[in-house]
Amino acid sequence: MQIAPLLHVGRGVMAIIGGGGKTTLMETLAGELSKKGKVIITTTTHIYRPEQYETLLDADEAAVSAALERSGIVCVASQAESGKLCAPRLSMGTLAQLADFVLVEADGAKRLPLKAHASHEPVIPEEAQRVIMVIGIDGVGKTIRETCHRSALYAQLALVDEETVVTPQLAARVVNAEGYGDRVYINKVESASDYEAAQAMANEFSCPVIAGSLHQGVYVCLH
């Protein structure tokens, strides 16, 4: 089963934001979309260097074009002092001219399922035609303090304290309060109880909602 059609991923630039699972979603989409055209994966913040793709650092247009001809999927970025990769020297608009699909990880969550966004986040490229909000269903049933990146801000947006247990409705309340994303993907939905929680969450959104498991490769449209 493929997730790209359910998320209506078209050609051009797409940003992925939210909780844990963004990198896996980006890599899953890259694999699917590479059957339809050339794919660039990149970031506007920081990501780990992907082992399975050719990575170009501070490359010019000619180098990117040549790599895409060789590989079909290429990571384009710069080297950050932290050892991670950061935003590339080339603009997103330029990358979109070189590849059919540009997938951008535009957020960080410290590998936690849920997050609230500080004033400087997310870093969504102005060229983005689709913004996917990722939510980890494994954050439901745990306290905000233990499962949310920027937990104090998350609690503030939810109008509760950090020891409050996250419910599907509470998680949706925070996403709706922030107003980011035109699609929601609920990840790690792998059991009947996960599905029930995901459906309860989806009922709170007005935008399309997809739920599933990137690990299992199974997805369903909930809204």
Language-model segment annotations:
Residues 30-79:
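N-terminal phosphate/diphosphate-binding loop that engages ATP/GTP or pyrophosphate donors
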Residues 2-35:
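Walker A (P-loop) phosphate-binding motif
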Residues 12-16, 71-82, 106, 157-159:
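Short, basic, glycine/proline-bearing loop/turn elements
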Residues 16, 39-43, 75-78, 102-106, ...:
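General beta-strand structural signal in soluble alpha/beta enzymes
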Residues 59-64, 146-162:
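Acidic, Ser/Thr-rich peripheral helices and adjacent loops at domain boundaries
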Residues 76-116:
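Phosphate-binding/switch loop-helix module in NTP-utilizing enzymes
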Residues 19, 106, 136-138, 156-170, ...:
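G-domain G4 guanine-recognition motif of GTPases
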Residues 118-140, 150:
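Inter-motif core of Ras-like GTPase G domains
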